[in-house]
Amino acid sequence: VTDIEADGPTPLHNSMLSFASVAIEADGTRHGEFEAVLTPRVDRQPNETTMEWWATQPEAYKAATEGAEDPALVMPRFADWVESLPGYKVFAAAPMIFDGLWMDHYLDQFAGTRVLGGPFRTRQIFRGGGVCLYTMAGTLRGAPYLDWGMSKLPAEFYGHIPHTHRAIDDARGFANVLVELFRLSSALPPITGSASDFR
C-alpha cells in the first residue's frame, strides 16, 4: 500500500515530494516498509493552491521535504525493493487514480517500469491493474458513489493510526484498511465466470 505527497495535483506540471509503501498480505502479514523524500523536479512548478494548503500543515510539509533525494536514485531503489519482496506484488492506494498516477509516472520516468502490470516489454514489478482502496471501501460498505470516501471508515479499520499527511503514517493506516477490506470480502459468496464471457 502506497501513499504519496505532492506540491500539486498532476505529475505533468508538479512534483512528488515524498512517498511511502507498506508491504502487506491480505492476512496482515507484513514484509517491510519503504519511505523516501524526493527533490522537486526542475522542470515542474508547485501549484499555488496546494502550497497554500501545505502552509496549514507545517509538520507534514517538513516531513515531506527534509532530507530529499534525487528521484533518479530513489525510484530504481524502490523498484529493487519491490522485487525483493516475496510472492507476486500488487500496487494498492487510496485512491488509485491519484497516488497510482504519480507513482506510475515517476517509475516510468526514472526506473523504466510501471505501477501497471501487462503485456509490456519493460521491467514489470507489479501484477495487474492494482487495487483502489477508495473503490473497494465504497463498494464493500454498500454505499452510493457520492457517499464513498476513506473518512467514512471507522477508526478501527485504520488501526487507530491518525491520517497526518506524512506519507508513512498514511500508508500504515491504509495498509490496515486493506486487511480489513479483505476480511469483509472473504465473507462474500464467490462470483465465477469463464474466459468466453470476456472478449
Residue ranges and their predicted role:
Residues 1-3:
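Short hydrophobic beta-strand that contains or immediately precedes a catalytic carboxylate
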Residues 5-96:
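Conserved non-catalytic scaffold segment of RNase H-like nuclease domains
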Residues 16-20, 107-111, 185:
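Glycine-rich, phosphate-binding/catalytic loops in enzymes
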Residues 90-96, 101-102, 146-199:
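Acidic, Mg2+-coordinating catalytic module of metal-dependent nucleases/exonucleases
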Residues 118-146:
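Short, flexible loop segments at boundaries between secondary-structure elements
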